[in-house]
């Protein structure tokens, strides 16, 4: 990478820029996991027993670096909570699956035409025709794993 004058940008600056970019990604992921757990927790509890405020306080303490602010009733402004019900986690789950699928391209080459064709045949063309874990395993040659997702997160 070079600046406007064509001079190389110092590695130190590039590293700092990457650290800053990854910091926001890590915070964003933590926030998504917080939202996912709100969704799963609220919809997993019996309506007669649920105390939304207490549950939110507990989840915020566990998943968020920000303290709960009394009287905010965050869940009332979390629009996805009604539209997605307990399925908000699908954002991170989809990323975990996509990262695992991408690992095959990383291993065999990003421009590997044979792998791309196999991806099309075994993933895109059959989507919805059978359980996802079956066609994912067929493409990867092994069961789905969260290892690639963990590696992605550990590099943030």
What are these regions (language model features)?
Residues 1-156:
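Cation-handling catalytic/transport regions enriched in His/Asp/Glu
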């Amino acid at each position: 990478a070079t600046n406007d004058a064509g001079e190389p940008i110092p590695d130190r600056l590039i590293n700092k820029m990457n650290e800053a970019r990854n910091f926001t990604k890590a915070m964003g992921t933590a926030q998504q996991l917080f939202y996912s757990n709100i969704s799963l927790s609220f919809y997993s509890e019996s309506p007669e027993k649920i105390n939304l405020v207490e549950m939110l306080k507990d989840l915020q303490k566990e998943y968020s670096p920000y303290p709960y602010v009394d009287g905010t009733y965050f869940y009332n402004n979390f629009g996805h909570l009604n539209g997605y019900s307990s399925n908000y986690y699908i954002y991170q789950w989809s990323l975990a699956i996509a990262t695992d699928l991408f690992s095959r391209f990383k291993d065999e080459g990003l421009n590997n035409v044979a792998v791309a064709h196999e991806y099309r045949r075994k993933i895109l063309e059959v989507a919805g025709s059978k359980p996802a874990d079956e066609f994912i395993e067929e493409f990867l040659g092994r069961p789905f794993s969260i290892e690639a997702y963990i590696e992605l997160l550990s590099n943030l």
